Amino acid sequence: MGGTDSKLNFRKAVVQLTTKKTAVEATDDTFWDQFWSESSATISDVFTLIPASEIRALRDENPSNLATLCYKCVEKLHNATLTGCSNPSEQLSILNCVRLLTRFVPYIFEDPDWRGFFWSTVPGQEEESFHGGEETAEARSPLAQTLLSAVADLCFCPEFTVHPPKKTGPDQPEDLSSIDSCEYIWEAGVGFASSPPGNPQFDCSRTELLKLLLTCFSEAMYLPPTAENHSRPNKWLSFFSSAGNRHALPIFTSLLNLVCSYDPLGYGVPYNHLMFADYREPLVEVAAQLLVVLLDHDSMQPTPTTMNGTDAEHSFEEPPVDNLFCNYLSRIHREEDFYFILHGVANLLNNPLIQTYLPNSCKKVSFHQELLVLFWKMCDQNKKFLFYVLKSSDVLDILVPILFHLNDARSDQSRLGLMHIGVFILLLLSGERNFGVRLNKPYSVRVPMDIPVFTGTHADFLVIVFHKIITNGHQRLQPLFDCLLTIIVNVSPYLKSLSMVAANKLLHLLEAFSTPWFLFSNATNHHLVFFLLEIFNNIIQYQFDGNSHLVYAIIRKRNIFHQLANLPTDPATVQKPRRRLASQGSDKDAQASGSEGEEKRPGTSTSAAESLPEMSADMSVKEVRNPASESETSDVEARSPGEATPPSTPGTSRIERKAIGRSASVTSSGSFVATPEWVQSWKQKLPLQTIMRMLQVLVPQVEKICIDKGLTDESEIIKFLQHGTLVGLLPVPHPILIRKYQANSGTQMWFRTYMWGIIYLRNIDPPIWYDTDVKLFEIQRV
């Protein structure tokens, strides 16, 4: 279809198919062959020449012709697995069938009455045409299984998708069912040592086959996001990830190795991506997407597996279906394989951060969201890999790009999904002690970010970015505040030397969160204060030595803690924020309508990811208490949440407090009414004893030395605090409490929605799912 005449002929065939009032016989090869016998086809031609309206008309008004077209395409693919497709014209015919199915399958999923079509056996005359009248296993198999088996076979078809073997005898058509596909894995890496020579044509054919597989698995897009709809197995994925797919292992290793071995920089020649076409990147991108989809299957099945690998304590009528892809991932155990995976993913995640003197001289990849989901799946389903990631400072090569993307996306409503996945990866990592230990490594890499310049460790970097998200992020991020502070709480017992920047920013967050206006505006806002106090207590109890900056900052801001201890509980003060909200309600409505009009102005679009449900609302956290005796002083340093703001320049603080207050007012419940009894119920539980005792001991000492020696320089005071001790003066150290992420149905549903939202948005060439009636998430267009 590359030439004008071939496009015209193809278009005429489409018109004939969609306008015929009678069914076209499956045996009319002259008619059907014109859909795939043209040369120089491109998938863009197929999508352009078959508009959505005509596909729906064919489906609704002449369903038998649509069914026969699908039968004939699958037949063509199946026959190719029996005879091979070494001939270029045969290969083009196969690709045209693949493109037709990729175009039509979403519209079959769109109609509930058609979803079972591929799971029916080939009826009547079509069966005789399909299998030559022979009674075979395929003849009794649903059409979907025949299609998936054929595509899997074609993924390892010599001279089409893989290099042919060296032959000693005469060339003969090769039955793909006799091929050992483990010898044809696409790339070296896990389970395969030799790297086949690159071939752009093979990469293009592989890409189109994988896109068809992805399309076949996308039925979930057309189901509303309810647990009932998604608790039933996806038959396509169930078969492809079962023992019925004899190529499951080579497909898994091919996909994984493709992603982890991809180097977008090549030989490092500047602007090489502008001079040479990169056929590998589209393949790597769809490989990452397909791998994530295959690893997601069964995550919401009736008998899920928990994070620690034990079966959930529930019984269901349907037995669980083994997912070979999850099984293969969980069984990877060699350190060289872990090294290959971790460094491959880290290399790609760090690609957008590369700085060069020549602008745009390096190729930048943009599938970081798929990589983050894939990394999550790896850590979630292979605990040995998670422990390997955390046992060295290599985990910081994952942390830095995650923080980069979090900071970059914090104000963009369309990237809320990216914010959630990044935060939840860090929450998962923070549940392990080694993550906190690794944060002590000095931060020397300078990433292009709009954060203050600082000298410190990766922990400082973490807190600076978190502070920026909380004080300067989109208002819909407030449900993530708990998660952000939980991460800092988890690592705080191991933070040996907070910088002054970090200390000031943590104190600034406490100052903002502890105002009566914020505390009394919402039923859960006081939890943030508890988290911050727990951070301070952990550092004071377990890492007092070396944290003189934080101690000094607490002394300077001691009035915050005194105000918390004396928080008013009288009705007038408690209900003042609500009266203020009521009095400003009309003004806020006017401002909201104006800002909404500005935000949704013509020419902007809202992505699918924007409509994703809030993830943190469904988060399960498992609390793990470590005895104080087991708590070692680890090599970790906390990062400050933002640039240091001296008390003498409160302008920035006012702006940031205003931002936090805005978030509080937006999320405050209209039915919530703070009462003195409610305030008293949690006020008496505020963990202030350790901090108050420290202030009671150190404040007089600091005041005395300042008077006696006439000290005015804070560095001298900090030096004095460095040599101080509180041994025997503080309460008995409390047990370290680690809050670990635990999967549940809500977060699993969120991950599935987010994953398919990414795939929908990323696949625009061709636009596989565009203009179809997607139900899993909301598509807003302008």
PLM ranges: what are they?
Residues 13-14, 31-35, 46, 73, ...:
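Generic structural signal of hydrophobic/aromatic residues within well-ordered alpha-helices
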Residues 17-20, 55, 132-133, 137, ...:
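Intrinsically disordered, low-complexity boundary segments flanking structured domains
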